[in-house]
């Protein structure tokens, strides 16, 4: 029996990353969620015209939504559909996951942050991090640790010569 060829495409499956989230929050754990999109939005995602850096995730009426995410419409987008780049989009999760997130946000004072958007086969997925905000001194210690690790790597590299 012949083996099926795996379709390895060059490039990454990542559409967009929220690098600022790791700087602003302690991310406890991440949960994968689907996202409800319109046709023109999927085309824009394929061309990489999305920004999740200023987005925030919230709970309303037992459902989870993302707001502030900007998907820029393509020039060749449909003329009969009015494109709203910053509309509120619903995130798709199981009821058990939603209840778990609602409990953690209400009890533990955590917040929900969009960290990464990527493709799983032909579906756009978004990782939602359960996070706690950092104080200013936490950010300073993180930057000092990052600088020290960079200097340490430089010293090790020069000592091996």
From Swiss-Prot:
Which domain of life does this protein belong to? Bacteria
Return the InterPro entries for the record: SmpB (IPR023620), SsrA-bd_prot (IPR000037), SsrA-bd_prot_CS (IPR020081)
Q: Cite a single GO MF annotation.
A: RNA binding
Looking at the record, which segments are called Disordered?
Answer: 138-161
Q: What keywords does the record list, in alphabetical order?
A: Cytoplasm, RNA-binding
GO CC term, one of those recorded: cytosol
Protein name from the UniProt record? SsrA-binding protein
Q: Which HAMAP family match?
A: SmpB
């Amino acid at each position: 029996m012949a083996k099926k060829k795996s379709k390895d495409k060059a490039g990454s499956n990542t559409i967009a990353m929220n690098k600022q989230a790791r700087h602003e929050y302690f991310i406890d754990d991440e949960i994968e969620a689907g996202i409800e999109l319109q046709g023109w939005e999927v085309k824009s995602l394929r061309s990489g015209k999305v920004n999740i850096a200023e987005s925030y995730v919230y709970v309303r009426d037992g459902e989870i939504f993302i707001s502030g995410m900007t998907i820029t419409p393509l020039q060749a987008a449909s003329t009969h559909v009015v494109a709203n780049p910053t509309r509120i989009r619903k995130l798709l999760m199981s009821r058990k996951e939603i209840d778990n997130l609602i409990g953690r946000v209400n009890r533990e004072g955590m917040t929900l942050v969009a960290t990464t958007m990527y493709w799983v086969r032909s579906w756009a997925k978004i990782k939602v991090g359960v996070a706690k905000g950092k104080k200013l001194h936490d950010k300073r210690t993180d930057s000092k640790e990052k600088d020290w690790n960079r200097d340490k790597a430089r010293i090790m590299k020069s000592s091996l010569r």
